[in-house]
């Protein structure tokens, strides 16, 4: 299913251009190490931007990190192709519209911000004084971090994620027991959802750092995938299970996305979005709710969601599904002998396992 990043995907794609392991990043690091500055403009077609490119000289040569480094010794800006395969111009003067607002102070960075806003293209500024790489794209600005800082930040975040994932799994396991006993409260559901939202929010906050790490972030990407595998799917199914009114998968995904972008949503706000009219958090323990059964059908019995809709439409709740015989289940469209037994046996097996734990 997947969720949107807190950092826009279009910006993440541009951050990838300057991640460690790329030729462009190698050149930028060399420029910083030599205590140079640089202003680099990435374009699709240089002829489109002749009104903002003045002076300098036309090269139209293949890109290499070494060439870019040598050209940065000159005072003017450098114009590259967007795919970083060509160097079009060197030592040019970039002249964006001076009326475009900018929050920057240095000349190089003011030019970069205005040009990115005016053209919607990537402009990279390297500060000679502060040894910082800044990427401007449209109205966005992203300051590139040092690799050591990124590794430290990502390592800490993954350690935190491991704890959150353990807690989330524990809450899910407890919820399963309550579901099978038909004594789930709204508080149980909200607590589980909140922990899942927090987990995915941390993931989206560190994702740009992992992208920025490039080749250095391969291990972190693997750990992140392992820690978050199916979490968003589980949360969507929980929302579908416990919304007061029936909701489609797409609606549940939108609800999930909304909560991930919020800062620490309250139990009350989660309850209300699920459709429950509660005024105080203490009320959540008094509201009994029943799962529809989507999560169990998909994750335990391995029933496709399209067929799961039919099962829920007939039996309404997980409690009723668990009481249905194989023959009853076979009356559902899309459920034959094999799937009926899969549902019945998976519920029985789960009950037995939870009882013996």
From Swiss-Prot:
Species classification: Bacteria, Thermotogati, Thermotogota, Thermotogae, Thermotogales
Residue numbers binding 3',3'-c-di-AMP: 76, 94, 107, 111, 128
Cofactor names from the entry are:
Mg(2+)
Pfam families according to UniProt: DAC, DisA-linker, HHH
Highest taxon of the lineage: Bacteria
Q: Does the keyword DNA damage apply?
A: yes
Q: Which gene encodes it?
A: disA
Instruction: Quote the record's cofactor note.
Output: Crystallized with Mn(2+) to trap in the pre-reaction state.
Keyword field contains DNA-binding: yes
What sort of enzyme, by top EC class, is this?
transferase
Q: Which GO terms describe its biological process?
A: DNA repair
Q: Share the domain note from the entry.
A: Consists of three domains: an N-terminal globular domain with diadenylate-cyclase (DAC) activity, a central helical domain and a C-terminal DNA-binding domain.
Q: Gene3D superfamilies given for it?
A: 5' to 3' exonuclease, C-terminal subdomain, DNA integrity scanning linker region, DNA integrity scanning protein, DisA, N-terminal domain
Q: What does this protein do?
A: Participates in a DNA-damage check-point. DisA forms globular foci that rapidly scan along the chromosomes searching for lesions. Has diadenylate cyclase activity, catalyzing the condensation of 2 ATP molecules into cyclic di-AMP (c-di-AMP). c-di-AMP likely acts as a signaling molecule that may couple DNA integrity with a cellular process. This rate-limiting step is the accessibility of the active site; mutating the possible exit tunnel (residues 128-130) increases product 2-fold despite Arg-130 being important for ATP-binding. Does not convert GTP to c-di-GMP.
Domain named DAC: residues: 8-148
Q: Which reaction does it catalyse?
A: 2 ATP = 3',3'-c-di-AMP + 2 diphosphate
Name it. DNA integrity scanning protein DisA
């Amino acid at each position: 299913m997947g969720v949107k990043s807190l950092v826009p995907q279009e910006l993440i794609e541009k951050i990838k251009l300057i991640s460690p392991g790329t030729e462009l990043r190698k050149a930028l690091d060399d420029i910083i190490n030599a205590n140079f500055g640089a202003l680099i403009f990435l374009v699709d077609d240089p002829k489109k931007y002749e009104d903002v490119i003045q002076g300098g000289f036309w090269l139209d040569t293949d890109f290499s990190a070494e060439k870019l480094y040598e050209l940065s010794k000159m005072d003017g800006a450098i114009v590259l192709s967007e795919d970083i395969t060509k160097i079009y111009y060197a030592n040019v003067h970039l002249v964006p519209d001076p009326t475009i607002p900018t929050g920057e102070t240095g000349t190089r960075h003011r030019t970069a911000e205005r040009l990115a806003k005016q053209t919607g293209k990537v402009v990279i500024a390297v500060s000679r004084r502060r040894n910082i790489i800044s990427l401007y794209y449209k109205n966005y600005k992203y300051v590139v971090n040092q690799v050591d800082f990124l590794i430290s930040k990502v390592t800490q975040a993954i350690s935190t994620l491991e704890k959150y994932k353990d807690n989330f799994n524990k809450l899910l396991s407890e919820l399963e027991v309550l579901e099978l006993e038909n004594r789930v409260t709204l508080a149980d559901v909200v607590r589980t959802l909140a922990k899942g939202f927090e987990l995915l929010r941390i993931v989206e906050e560190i994702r740009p750092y992992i992208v920025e790490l490039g080749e250095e972030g391969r291990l972190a990407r693997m750990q992140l995938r392992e820690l978050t595998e199916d979490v968003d799917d589980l949360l969507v199914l929980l929302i579908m299970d416990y919304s007061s009114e029936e909701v489609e998968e797409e609606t549940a995904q939108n609800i999930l996305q909304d909560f991930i972008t919020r800062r620490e949503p309250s139990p009350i706000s989660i309850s209300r979005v699920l459709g429950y009219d509660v005024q105080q958090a203490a009320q959540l323990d008094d509201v009994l709710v029943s799962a529809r059964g989507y999560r169990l059908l998909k994750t335990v019995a391995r029933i496709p969601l399209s067929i799961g809709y039919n099962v829920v439409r007939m039996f309404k709740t997980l409690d009723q599904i668990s009481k249905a015989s194989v023959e009853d289940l076979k009356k559902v469209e899309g459920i034959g002998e094999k799937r009926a037994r899969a549902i019945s046996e998976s519920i029985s097996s789960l009950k037995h396992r939870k009882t013996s734990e």
